[in-house]
Amino acid sequence: MFEYKRFLFVAIFALSGFVQSKDLPNFTELAEESSPAVVNITSTKTVSNRNSFGGGFGDPRYDEFFERFFGQPRPSDPRQNSRPVVSTGSGFIISKDGFLLTNNHVVEGADEITISLGDRREFKAEVIGADARSDVALLKIDAKNLPTLRIGSSKELKVGEWVVAIGSPFQLRFSVTSGIVSAKGRSIPNGSDSTYVPFLQTDVAINPGNSGGPLFNL
């Protein structure tokens, strides 16, 4: 009798899990329809490295050393080595003629921006406009008849709703992750100022390379 009860308990528990799983959303259609309008962004900019006496001293303590023992600032090394720095991010197309959105920090100060589409085509992009406080940048590529995404409104979005992100974390292009809306109306400190755009907080997995990618509600 004891064995029978244990089997009955396990069977009911498994059935309960099956019923709950039927209520989980299916993201396949959204991923298939939306992924073509999501892009991978590679930006390159040049930074300068100052080397002192070829030894790579950049510690302020060496400045204090020269001031104390020689009575003058440490002489600067005229040699400056510049090197390219490459960063990656995501974005999404908002018009068939090549306008797209991303985060400003993905392309800020970039000398060159390359956009990679889902069909493996690549284009050089131009920054049309950017706003550092809201961290949004508008880019343009020379292409036609592109797949697009429509910008939605978050007014009716509720905490606890399912959301999906598509992007290129760690350069793993067009990856889909899901989660829920954790909170609305968040602001992010920006030095002495606070960002004036209310952000959504979500538990969707966001990693380096996801920046600038779209977040979808169902």
Where are these regions (language model features)?
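Bacterial N-terminal signal peptides that target proteins for export
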Residues: 1-8
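Pyridoxal 5′-phosphate
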Residues: 9, 13
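Serine-dependent protease modules
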Residues: 20-218
